[in-house]
Amino acid sequence: MSSQDVLIHSDDPCHPANLICTLCKQFFHNNWCTGTGGGISIKDPNTNYYYLAPSGVQKEKMTPEDLFVMDAQTLEYLRSPKLYKPSACTPLFLACYQKKDAGAIIHTHSQNAVICSLVFGDEFRIANIEQIKAIPSGKVDPVTKKPMALSFFDTLKIPIIENMAHEDELIDDLHKTFKDYPDTCAVIVRRHGIFVWGPTIDKAKIFNEAIDYLMELAIKMYQMGIPPDCAIGEEKKHLKMASP
């Protein structure tokens, strides 16, 4: 086995190379990463290496041999597959690692994200929904010193940026969202999809699933005439549906 292949072969299902393939297959079946769209990157906390899904690979068929591995310090590729080129998302993944101290980033072409980007303006908003409690608030508990989640009564806000012809051209707007929304763990790209990050791949996956649930719910609320961020008790005032 070559020194490059050692980086991607492990019997541990939680090894980044194995996890990326497992999750990409799962996300394909969730209809989030079809037609080679989307991608995942995970930072190995033991080595400080970035593992990155390549461009142009069918996500449900991806294997560890298809992955790129990059040194987090030098940003040099330690391993490059012969059949694929680096993902166009790579500069965006690196920005999340460097500016948000992310441990993993998920990019999907979720239809819920795309629809929400057409319905909302500069930001997606939803409030007073239980699932919001799965999303980090960006604040730290003064007693436990642990990160705090949003509460049921909080409003989740996710910035929406305009799509570009090439994904690496999104970098300036992504940096702007880091400044304007310092507590966000996601950004929606209009008519494109969503990027979600977290301190670990487990957290990023939870955030991504919760946000997609909330976006789907917001779409259904919008179809009923209910503003997704409306106050508790105000829902029936907005209903388009006739009373039974």
Curated annotation (Swiss-Prot):
Residues at the active site: 130
Cofactor(s) of this protein: Zn(2+)
GO MF entries: methylthioribulose 1-phosphate dehydratase activity; zinc ion binding
EC main group: lyase
Annotated cofactor note: Binds 1 zinc ion per subunit.
Primary location: cytoplasm
Pathway where it operates: Amino-acid biosynthesis; L-methionine biosynthesis via salvage pathway; L-methionine from S-methyl-5-thio-alpha-D-ribose 1-phosphate: step 2/6
Gene3D superfamilies listed in its UniProt record: Class II aldolase/adducin N-terminal domain
Entry's localization field: Cytoplasm
Annotated positions binding substrate: 89
Example GO BP: L-methionine salvage from methylthioadenosine
Domain of life assignment: Eukaryota
Binding of Zn(2+), residues: 107, 109, 192
Reactions catalysed according to its record: 5-(methylsulfanyl)-D-ribulose 1-phosphate = 5-methylsulfanyl-2,3-dioxopentyl phosphate + H2O
Family note: Belongs to the aldolase class II family. MtnB subfamily.
Name of protein: Methylthioribulose-1-phosphate dehydratase
Organism: Saccharomyces cerevisiae (strain JAY291)
